[in-house]
Amino acid sequence: MKNKNVIQKMREKIPLIHCITNYVTINDCANILLSFGASPAMCEAYDEVYDFVSISSALYINLGTLTKEQETAAVLASISAKNHNVPVVIDPVGCPAIKRKVEVINRIAEVGRIDIIKGNIGEIKFLAGMDSETRGVDSLDNGENALNACTQLAKKYNCIVAATGQKDFVSDGKRGSVIKNGTEMLTKVTGAGCMLGALCAATCANFEDKLVSTTAAILSMNIAGEKAYEKAQLPGSFRIALIDNIYMISDEEIWERGNVEWK
């Protein structure tokens, strides 16, 4: 897998990533995409999304602070993505607490398309119909059977599924990866998961093997976090160092430093 130039190909293309995301972390998602080498657009007006998706490289839908207006825009955007062959990444933030979000995901799967679902372990287990431990938008799950949950959900939606936690798990329904990089400090800043979803959209935009591209996105975030923590041990300075290290991350670094078990 070390010959997979996911980041290089992404930076050569400078993909336009259309984000319909939450109000808490919208700025973080835009900044990390810019640092990574992509071009973010935070467009969510119903009258604009269909046309804008048609010129985008990927669509990122984050359900964190889902309003009715965002819901209708997200569904329409997914229809445009299906019609224009634009990959879609879904982040089901808080779905165990708010069941309407599951209905939105199912609606998008029905009328649009889903290429990647990226959530924490609790969210992914919940969507897979398994017992999970969550508190609001946070997972309290220990990760047991997480890869199995990813595999089941990947088969259900015919997409890539990633579950994040102390270890991270990715599956396409047949193949999988387990990632053991990262730092606990990523849980001490708001929006690390949302930013990761944006990176997944960037790496999948122009890379055919989305299991590999999703694994590369997670490695990029986790290794940038590890390096950031080496220089910044407090949350405020860590957030800034994280963005800086995403800017400097490379394919060579993620595959050499990455602790990945391929399944």
Curated annotation (Swiss-Prot):
Residues bound to ATP: K118, T164
Reactions that this protein is recorded to catalyse: 5-(2-hydroxyethyl)-4-methylthiazole + ATP = 4-methyl-5-(2-phosphooxyethyl)-thiazole + ADP + H(+)
Binding, substrate: M42, G191
Cited InterPro entries: Hyethyz_kinase, Ribokinase-like
SUPFAM superfamilies, alphabetized: Ribokinase-like (SSF53613)
Cofactor(s), names only, from the UniProt record: Mg(2+)
Name of the protein described by the UniProt record: Hydroxyethylthiazole kinase 1
UniProt organism field: Clostridium botulinum (strain Langeland / NCTC 10281 / Type F)
Lineage: Bacteria, Bacillati, Bacillota, Clostridia, Eubacteriales
Protein's gene: thiM1
